[in-house]
Amino acid sequence: MAIITDVYAREVLDSRGNPTLEVEVYTESGAFGRGMVPSGASTGEHEAVELRDGDKSRYGGLGTQKAVDNVNNVIAEAIIGYDVRDQQAIDRAMIALDGTPNKGKLGANAILGVSIAVARAAADYLEVPLYSYLGGFNTKVLPTPMMNIINGGSHSDAPIAFQEFMIMPVGAPTFKEALRWGAEVFHALKKILKERGLETAVGDEGGFAPKFEGTEDGVETILKAIEAAGYEAGENGIMIGFDCASSEFYDAERKVYDYSKFEGEGGAVRTAAEQIDYLEELVNKYPIITIEDGMDENDWDGWKALTERLGGRVQLVGDDFFVTNTDYLARGIKEEAANSILIKVNQIGTLTETFEAIEMAKEAGYTAVVSHRSGETEDSTIADIAVATNAGQIKTGSLSRTDRIAKYNQLLRIEDQLGEVAQYKGIKSFYNLDKCGR
């Protein structure tokens, strides 16, 4: 039988050495599922609540024993007896049990751990891969990866404001080849950094965190690495993306983007209009295909102006702006702000709500990018979600650190399992951009 008989959570560590949750779900048949919960460093103001203990004498206040107790003593009692295949009913039951708009009572981390474990247990019961269980028979698209090879902002100690400099192998024929291209550029970049006497230590997401002279220096160095690895920059090869994480350096009182927060005294201070001009300047100068959080999460006028200026040429991804929430996404669609949503399961807290956000985005002609968090685990669920939803894009870090590679390796397995059915769309993943042949 597929009936849930036990739910158990424990406290484990994430890739930063901070506590997080691992949840296990058991059924009468012996089918079993386990889910682990990621955590972000730069978090959106409107994200669902990640419940922490606040006890400074233990893990600096970051313990998750309250969330663990909520799973073991509250959620377990509520969902034991459910059919493990009834994902939506279980997720809705947990949302109702919490009763708050931001999951602040039980904790989104507690709810998400259960949601993932339930899905994995259902797949185990049906003896099918997780991506097949979640996506059905039409599952076939391997995502084009966003590879974060330079870390800045809140993800490193490097004096550069933009949080991520990414490469996307849009011209590769398969996911396996895309991964190889990215790995070779990553190693070429390491060699170039060493030759310049720059640091090759890696940040939270596995990218390098050197002391560049500025944003342009970072981009120019990546372009050299692409060439050194034997590839070309552009639509037939490898393109570049940014996660500006602009909310991290936006000064709401002064209404300016203050780069000096990360770059020191020489950092620019830009108004919203100047921020848009600067991003357009970068797009005109370099082969940039995607920009995430180019404006502050509450700067709706700025987002609309940025979209009007660049929305036909560049993917403009809302992360902190949308926080995987259909209410914010619906407003963005209505006001024509952004043209893509970043999907982070722990921003919203259940797989059901995650899938609803992806579906809403697609129906509106927005792209959806399935994403990791800076604090990750060996859990590879997001790889399965990316394929299950045919999202077409995934953002899961650089080509180092096992917590990042776990997702890439799972995608390699899935591509093998799908065989001739597997599709890698590359540049066609950006189906809502003029430059991609719409």
Curated annotation (Swiss-Prot):
It is an enzyme of class 4 (lyase). It catalyses: (2R)-2-phosphoglycerate = phosphoenolpyruvate + H2O. Keywords: Cytoplasm, Glycolysis, Lyase, Magnesium, Metal-binding, Secreted. GO terms for molecular function: magnesium ion binding; phosphopyruvate hydratase activity. (2R)-2-phosphoglycerate binds at Q163, K344, R373, S374, K395. Its EC number is 4.2.1.11. Mg(2+) binds at D243, E292, D319. It comes from the Bacteria. Its cofactor is Mg(2+). GO terms for cellular component: cell surface; extracellular region; peptidoglycan-based cell wall; phosphopyruvate hydratase complex. The keyword Plastid does not apply. NCBIfam families: eno. This is Enolase.
